[in-house]
């Protein structure tokens, strides 16, 4: 019998520690982390850590051995090793004072690309769109950061550029479906090629960068995500027939940098412009050759030209006469439709699938300077509306060119307005958000300047939980009190029923005697029968509850430990949600009571 070697099977073979992986790949720990981020390899948790670590109980990080073997054939790994030798040569040249050789090394420095990794990790385009949420969140985060020693201004500008290109595409194709303004920032949801994409855009406030953040790891993720977004944007722009990257209008960018400063050109128009000059040149060359040959032919055949011209004229006359005769023969009667009631006219299908895409197509919005233009401009343009910004108008020289008579809505975030223009609807910014979330135009009465706004709810909230928009019923408290009293009565009756179940036989024997006694006292038998019915109802209710509990217990017995834990977690979370909903309902009732009291006092005054 062969003796089995230790640590050659199972967890010891399938897992490898981080220090072993770094030693095997012959790279530094920082390069190993970067490589794992690029390739999407993460630490794993073995079932038996002691066996995986070959008997040791020291806390370590484990990876799959196959993943590390897969990393050994990565081209980026070779580039990391080349960079290591380059850094060694550069430090040696600088130490010796050889500036020219250091410059030459810097100019010939090798660079790596992540294109092949993107293709490996996302073999199809829908896969890339499904994983684009984290990429957008990271890029929008960096686009709002201030430039520091750790994060250069070039990185921030590149992130801003990619973010604006993404927003410009979404607004152009009108793909926004949901929006929610929270404490963290603004959440957007768009439908990209049938996939729901949700991302967070932070508010443009000055950020205080914490000192404990490891920017090396974050910048590695940013490098990968920016490459991924370049791929995705190129595909989206080309599928829509647009040129990528879009051009930037420098004049508009200087006035106010926004989506309006991007020029989205069609690829078809551009291709036609490129093809026209070549086609014109070819036509000119052909015409010049034909003219030279014709001159020589005319000089040679001057005598025959007159005869040929006469014959051609006669043939043309004959053809015209034949055509007239045919038209006279084939003329048909014309029938006019005298019916005033026309048939049903079919509504032509819209270019856009969702009603949100053309929600503001008939409106022109004038955004006041106190309102954040970047949020509202993106939402209004993606719903088909037009935007005029007061902040941008302050910097424009020729204000007369802008037609302000077309403005239908003015978005204001002030409590009181002194001067109002007739014909405009004055609203607060929340009107835009609620219209998009509901998919229809909401009445503007509740959103007038200075009005108390309705609650701004998350469109991705739990449908089972508390609904703040539900009206408060006046008799809810009385019902709850009566319900609690009835429950107490039912419990008392149940206890009596349980005690009476033991001696049912005695009750049957004494029933006749009770009836006789009641008749002697003058009490009707029908009253006692109604009381018995109530008792029977409560008895049936209790039986149903007991049966349901027994069924649940039996199902729990048949479950595995994993399923039992999951079921308990679900029960706990549902109970918590119900408790929170009840607390919020109670608060709402109290607020409604206080408002009613205040209204009564105001009416008395």
Swiss-Prot record:
Coiled coil: 294-342, 530-605
Localization terms from the record: Nucleus, Nucleolus; Nucleus, Nucleoplasm
Pfam families reported for this sequence: BRCT_2 (PF16589), Pescadillo_N (PF06732)
Residues the record lists as Phosphoserine modifications: 288
Knocked-out gene: effects: Essential gene. Reduced assembly of 60S ribosomes and accumulation of halfmer polyribosomes.
GO biological process entries: maturation of 5.8S rRNA from tricistronic rRNA transcript (SSU-rRNA, 5.8S rRNA, LSU-rRNA); maturation of LSU-rRNA from tricistronic rRNA transcript (SSU-rRNA, 5.8S rRNA, LSU-rRNA); maturation of SSU-rRNA from tricistronic rRNA transcript (SSU-rRNA, 5.8S rRNA, LSU-rRNA); ribosomal large subunit biogenesis; rRNA processing
Effect of residue 380 to R: Temperature sensitive mutant
Record-annotated BRCT domain positions: 355-449
Region (Sufficient for interaction with ERB1): 51-484
Function, in words: Component of the NOP7 complex, which is required for maturation of the 25S and 5.8S ribosomal RNAs and formation of the 60S ribosome.
Family: Belongs to the pescadillo family.
Protein name as it appears in the record: Pescadillo homolog
Organism, scientific name: Saccharomyces cerevisiae (strain ATCC 204508 / S288c) (Baker's yeast)
Lineage, broadest ranks: Eukaryota, Fungi, Dikarya, Ascomycota, Saccharomycotina
């Amino acid at each position: 019998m062969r003796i089995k070697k230790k640590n050659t099977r199972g967890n010891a073979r399938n897992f490898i520690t981080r220090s072993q992986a770094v030693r095997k790949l012959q790279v530094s720990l920082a390069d190993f982390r970067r490589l794992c981020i690029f390739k999407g390899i993460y630490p794993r948790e073995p079932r038996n850590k002691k066996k995986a670590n070959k008997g040791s109980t020291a806390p370590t990080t484990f990876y799959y051995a196959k993943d590390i073997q897969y990393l050994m054939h990565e081209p980026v790994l070779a580039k990391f090793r080349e960079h290591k030798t380059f850094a060694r040569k550069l430090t040696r040249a600088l130490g010796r004072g050889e500036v020219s050789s250091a410059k030459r090394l810097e100019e010939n420095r090798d660079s790596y690309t992540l294109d092949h990794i993107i293709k490996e990790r996302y073999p199809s385009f829908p896969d890339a769109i499904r994983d684009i949420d984290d990429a957008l969140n990271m890029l929008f985060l960096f686009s709002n950061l201030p430039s520091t020693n750790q994060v250069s201004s070039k990185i921030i500008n590149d992130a801003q550029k990619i973010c604006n290109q993404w927003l410009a595409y979404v607004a152009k194709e009108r793909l926004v479906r949901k929006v929610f303004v929270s404490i963290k920032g603004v959440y957007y949801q768009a439908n990209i090629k049938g996939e729901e994409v949700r991302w967070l855009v932070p508010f443009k406030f000055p950020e205080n960068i914490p000192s404990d953040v490891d920017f090396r790891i974050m910048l590695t993720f940013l490098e990968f995500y920016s490459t991924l977004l370049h791929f995705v944007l190129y595909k989206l722009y080309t599928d829509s027939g647009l040129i990528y990257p879009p051009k930037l209008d420098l004049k508009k960018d200087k006035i106010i940098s926004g989506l309006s400063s991007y020029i989205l050109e069609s690829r078809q128009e551009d291709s036609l412009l490129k093809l026209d000059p070549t086609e014109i040149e070819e036509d000119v060359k052909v015409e010049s050759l034909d003219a030279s040959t014709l001159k020589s032919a005319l000089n040679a055949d001057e005598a025959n030209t007159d005869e040929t011209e006469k014959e051609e004229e006669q043939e043309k006359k004959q053809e015209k006469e034949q055509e007239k005769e045919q038209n006279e023969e084939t003329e048909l009667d014309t029938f006019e439709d005298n019916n005033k009631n026309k048939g049903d006219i079919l509504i032509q299908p819209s270019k856009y699938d969702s009603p949100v895409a053309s929600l503001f197509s008939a409106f022109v919005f004038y955004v006041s300077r106190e309102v954040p233009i970047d949020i509202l401009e993106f939402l209004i343009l993606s719903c088909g509306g037009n935007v005029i910004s007061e902040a941008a108008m302050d910097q424009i020289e020729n204000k007369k060119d802008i037609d302000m008579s077309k403005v239908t809505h003015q978005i204001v975030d002030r409590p009181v307005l002194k001067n109002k223009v007739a014909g405009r609807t004055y609203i607060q910014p929340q009107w835009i958000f609620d219209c998009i979330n509901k998919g229809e135009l909401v009445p503007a009465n509740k959103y007038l300047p200075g009005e108390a706004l309705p609650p701004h709810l998350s469109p991705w909230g739990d449908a089972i939980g508390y609904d703040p928009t539900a009206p408060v019923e006046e008799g809810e408290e009385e019902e709850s009190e009566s319900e609690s009293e009835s429950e107490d009565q039912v419990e008392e009756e149940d206890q009596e029923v349980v005690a009476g179940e033991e001696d049912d036989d005695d009750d049957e024997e004494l029933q006749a005697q009770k009836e006789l006694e009641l008749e002697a006292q003058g009490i009707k038998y029908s009253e006692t029968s109604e009381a018995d019915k109530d008792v029977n109802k409560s008895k049936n209710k209790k039986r149903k509850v007991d049966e349901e509990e027994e069924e649940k217990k039996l199902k729990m017995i048949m479950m595995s430990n994993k399923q039992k834990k999951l079921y308990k977690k679900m029960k706990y979370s549902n109970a918590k949600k119900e408790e929170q909903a009840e607390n919020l309902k109670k608060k709402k009732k109290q607020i409604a009571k206080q408002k009613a009291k205040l209204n009564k006092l105001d009416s008395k005054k």
